[in-house]
């Protein structure tokens, strides 16, 4: 009987701690997201994509829905843009953008862009390699999809010399 009490007290304590951590992380993510319109001055986004890419258009809408002004440039050769703004080969995705002096590559969420302009690190840009399911522009909207089907993914920072490091971690 005594072992049962200890087990449940320990389990309850772990639950309280994890709930508090989840709450704190949720509040922090909300602060960064809400800061876009209130405190962060993010310049106009200059986006480059091919005409045939639908997910790129959805990513642009994600930025616009979060208050950013986006110039949508449809280009014949997206790879030329990736060379012009030296994006490491292993980080390349379907679309690129410039915001002030930063390059944004792939399906980077608004929260990471906000973080970039809050911290203002000395980097060339940030990227989401590939096309993770659930990232902005890669959402599935149907009665069968659930957020738990989405992937966790990393936003990677990169320098002009190609040095990379984890900038942000995104979980569904």
What are these regions (language model features)?
Residues 38-60:
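Local sequence-structure signature of Cys/Sec-based thiol-disulfide redox active-site neighborhoods
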Residues 22-30:
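C-terminal segment of classical bacterial N-terminal signal peptides
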């Amino acid at each position: 009987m005594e072992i049962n009490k200890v087990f449940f007290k320990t389990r309850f304590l772990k639950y309280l701690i994890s709930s508090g951590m989840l709450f704190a992380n949720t509040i922090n993510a909300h602060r960064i997201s809400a800061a876009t319109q209130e405190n962060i001055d993010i310049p106009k986004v200059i986006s480059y994509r091919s005409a045939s890419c639908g997910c790129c258009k959805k990513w642009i809408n994600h930025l616009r829905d979060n208050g950013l002004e986006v110039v949508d440039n449809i280009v014949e050769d997206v790879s030329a843009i990736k060379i012009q703004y030296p994006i490491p080969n292993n980080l390349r995705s379907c679309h690129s953008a410039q915001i002030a002096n930063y390059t944004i590559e792939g399906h980077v969420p608004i929260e990471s862009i906000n973080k970039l302009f809050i911290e203002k690190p000395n980097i060339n840009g940030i990227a989401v390699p590939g096309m993770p399911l659930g990232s902005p522009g890669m959402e599935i909207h149907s009665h069968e999809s659930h957020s738990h089907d989405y992937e966790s993914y990393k936003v990677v920072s990169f320098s002009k010399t190609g040095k990379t490091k984890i900038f942000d971690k995104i979980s569904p």
